[in-house]
Amino acid sequence: MANITAALVKELREKTGAGMMDCKGALNETNGDLEAAVDWLRKKGLAKAAKKAGRVAAEGLVAVESAGHHAAIVEVNSETDFVARNDGFQAFAREAAKLALNTDGTLEGLQAATFPGSSETVQEKLSNLIATIGENMTLRRVAKLEVSKGVIASYVHGQISEGLGKIGVLVALESEGDVEVLSTLGRQIAMHIAATSPVALDASGVDPAVVERESNILREKNAGKPDHVMAKIVESGLKSYYKEVTLLEQPFVHDGSKTITQVLKEAAGKAGAEVAIKGFIRYALGEGIEKEEGPDFAAEVASMSR
């Protein structure tokens, strides 16, 4: 049997909002498997759907850079927030985002690019920065968005300097409409994406494995129902799920009475042309990276007194 620690129970409670005893029971039933325990609780109706963002603990910066009809976003990690506020680190992150505009959009392509004002590659520049500052750093990921007509809007949450912060969003609006209207709308939608963290533009973009997982949970929660009833339950449940996690179906954070789809239709009238979201990118600092926590302070003091 797995060792069910208090920390594991706490993490499951934070993910699901379920009670302590329910979480302990779920972990015992699933032999300490955290994700399986989340599903177990949901099947029992004891937890809401959990977003798989993972524990966020890495430090560093997300940087965005726009230039006309294309934009780039990068994430550079450091071990401490102190280093993330270092001028040299910030300059590196900003230049990396600018360079990404003219690369192929891959991490390898950016790492191999020549850093401005030197003969070094981006990766070599980072290695020298590590040696200078004395802390490990990583150029973790990069992405680009392009649009032939329209605008690419950006938003940085937790901004500590222009284009640098904890969450970065790019959203491409494709339209022949008024650029000022599109720019304002784009920024509002970028802020919406930062707040709601959609996993896809619409239902067709959701990972089939995730859809199957949600379907199985709905079936197990409603076990014993006739087949024709079960089919309707699963269909209805998936519709609710899509409204929660797909951008076009989400209620607009600036006006909850409208979905993003409805907002785009209304914007077409103001812009003088149809408006469509071609794509979006959302980077949250440290997303999916798990950092080992230090020992419990009370336990550490107790051990020292033995």
UniProtKB/Swiss-Prot annotation:
- Extract the Gene3D superfamilies matched here: 1.10.286.20, DNA helicase RuvA subunit, C-terminal domain, Elongation factor Ts, dimerisation domain
Q: Which SUPFAM superfamilies match?
A: Elongation factor Ts (EF-Ts), dimerisation domain, UBA-like
Q: What organism does the UniProt record list as the source?
A: Methylorubrum populi (strain ATCC BAA-705 / NCIMB 13946 / BJ001) (Methylobacterium populi)
Family as reported in the entry's similarity comment: Belongs to the EF-Ts family.
Please state the protein's primary subcellular location: cytoplasm
Role, per record: Associates with the EF-Tu.GDP complex and induces the exchange of GDP to GTP. It remains bound to the aminoacyl-tRNA.EF-Tu.GTP complex up to the GTP hydrolysis stage on the ribosome.
Upper lineage is: Bacteria, Pseudomonadati, Pseudomonadota, Alphaproteobacteria, Hyphomicrobiales
**This chain belongs to which protein, by name?**
Elongation factor Ts
Q: Which GO terms describe its cellular component?
A: cytoplasm
Which UniProt keywords are listed?
Cytoplasm, Elongation factor, Protein biosynthesis
Task: Give the molecular function GO annotations.
Answer: translation elongation factor activity
The segments labelled Involved in Mg(2+) ion dislocation from EF-Tu in the record are: 80-83
The cross-references to Pfam families, in alphabetical order and at most eight, read: EF_TS
**Subcellular localization:** Cytoplasm
The record's InterPro entries line, in alphabetical order, gives: EF-Ts_dimer_sf (IPR036402), Transl_elong_EFTs/EF1B (IPR001816), Transl_elong_EFTs/EF1B_dimer (IPR014039), Transl_elong_Ts_CS (IPR018101), UBA-like_sf (IPR009060)
Does the record carry Protein biosynthesis as a key word? Answer: yes
